[in-house]
Each structure stands twice: as C-alpha cells, then as structure tokens.
Amino acid sequence: MEYIKTATEVYILKIIGGPASQLLASRTARALGTEPVLCEFNRFPDGELYLRIAEEIENEKVTLIQSTPTDSDFVALLQLIDACEGAAEINVVIPYMGYARQDKKFKSGEPVSARAIARCINADRVFTINIHEKSVLEHFPCPAENLDAAALIGSYVAGFGLERPMLVAPDEGARGLVKNVASGHGFDHDHLQKTRLSGDTVVIKTKNLDVTGRHVVLVDDMIATGGTMAESIRMLKSQGAIDVHLACVHPVLTRNAALRLFHAGVKDIIGTDTLEKAESKLSVAPLIAEALSGY
C-alpha cells in the first residue's frame, strides 16, 4: 500500500510485528496488500531481549504492532520504537495494553501505572483496541485513538446461526460494548444485575429479559481469571438458558481460566487475536488496516 506525500515522495507502509503480535501483524500486512517486515528476536544468556529489524526502514512510514500483556513485551515495544529511529513516521498499534486497568491510584503511594506506561511511547500516533479505560489515551504524548472491535464480534456471532440469541453484559461496565455488538443485527441484549437477598446470598440475573429457552452470548472486553464469568454461566444455565457462549475482545485467560469456564458449562469461548491464544478465533486485522488506511 502506497502513501503519496508529494509529487516526488512516495512511502510504502512498513508493518512490523513485535514478538507478542506476529500473526496479527502478518494478517494486517496482508489486509493492506503488503508483507510484514522481517525482524530477528533472540535472548542473551542473561535473559535480556535482542531484536533487529532486518529491512531498511529509514525515511519510511512504519507501523509497529505489539500487544503488551507482560513487562517483557512492553520492553520489546520500546526497543522496536528505538530501532525505528530515522523513520519518516512511526505509528504504534497496541492491540492489548497491559496495565490499562491501573488508571488511577487506589491507595496512597501507588503509581498510576497506565499513565507511566503511556508516557513512554515515543511515536507519532498510537492506536489501541477496546482499551479498558479510555481515559488512558489522554496520557500518551501523541495523538491516540481507540478502535472498537464490536462490529467484528457482532458479525462473528451472527455467523453462529443461533435462533434468537440474547447478548448479555456481565455488568454495567460492559453494557456499551454489548449494545455495539448487537447493533446492526437486531440481537436482544441485556445486562446482569446482582441482587443481595441476605448477608451471604446474592442472586445474579438479567435485568430486563428472560433467558429461559434462549441461546445466551456473554460479551465483555476481556476475560482474565474467569471467576465472575463462571459464576454468571452457572446462574444463566440454572435460569433456563439453552446454552451460554462467551465472546471477548481480549482473551487474557490467566492460569486455568478456560478450564474453569468449561467446567461451569460454557459451550464456546471466542476471543480476538489482540492476544494470540487458542481461543483467538477472530482477527482484528481488518480493523487495524482500515484505521491505518485513513492516515
């Protein structure tokens, strides 16, 4: 894909994938009609990361794609940005941004970790995907844009062929995402509400709609430990749901989360490739490619 700056300057968009986002970078490059730039990644004997961009990128327009689920992945992103010194423009895509949930101080003496991370990104433009707290975008020292994968998830769910599926948010915070996923497909949607009956008895149920005899799709931006989702799955099935599917943007799925969810009775887990897991059945590459095409 070519970006024409002037009559004499033509830049070929260079897509560079970090170690955490190799597949996504390749898919994005293909969506843009190009090939990803080759990189070398290795470890020194003491465990430090070595990387090298194996193609010439000086005076080129480059886009780095790297999720940062671990500290090591964040360091790799910083190294990639530094290795691109001399490029005409550096765009950074952080599909999943670690520390984004630490967007404020909860106790005295704590850092605002999301702010600390964002301030380190020295680029011309940053893209995130369904970042947990949009306020984090204000901390980047450059223009930052949050992309929404809701429409991709909606189309994927529509492909299930379920009769009258109901989309459900596990809490108030996910209502906006669920509404956007349902938009354009006419899906019924609702959210779960906790009602405390006594000191130790809490009932979780949909606020407005009855799940009896319905195919339910629980939707959230991320699934981490799976504890809350597992509880929700059991409650929905006990209330008459035919089956329960899970769909999320970021399949973090720490430790035995997937096992916990299947033990609770989930039929399927669908995530995107913002994180490359076995559950990453849907690619956000078209979303990234479309965003990059606008610049």
Curated annotation (Swiss-Prot):
Major place of residence: cytoplasm
Annotated protein name in UniProt: Ribose-phosphate pyrophosphokinase
Entry EC number(s): 2.7.6.1
Catalysed reaction equations from the record: D-ribose 5-phosphate + ATP = 5-phospho-alpha-D-ribose 1-diphosphate + AMP + H(+)
Source species: Methanosarcina mazei (strain ATCC BAA-159 / DSM 3647 / Goe1 / Go1 / JCM 11833 / OCM 88) (Methanosarcina frisia)
Cofactor note: Binds 2 Mg(2+) ions per subunit.
Residue sites binding D-ribose 5-phosphate per the record: 196, 220
Source domain of life: Archaea
Catalytic site positions: 194
Chain positions recorded as Mg(2+) 2 binding sites: 171
UniProtKB keywords: ATP-binding, Cytoplasm, Kinase, Magnesium, Metal-binding, Nucleotide biosynthesis, Nucleotide-binding, Transferase
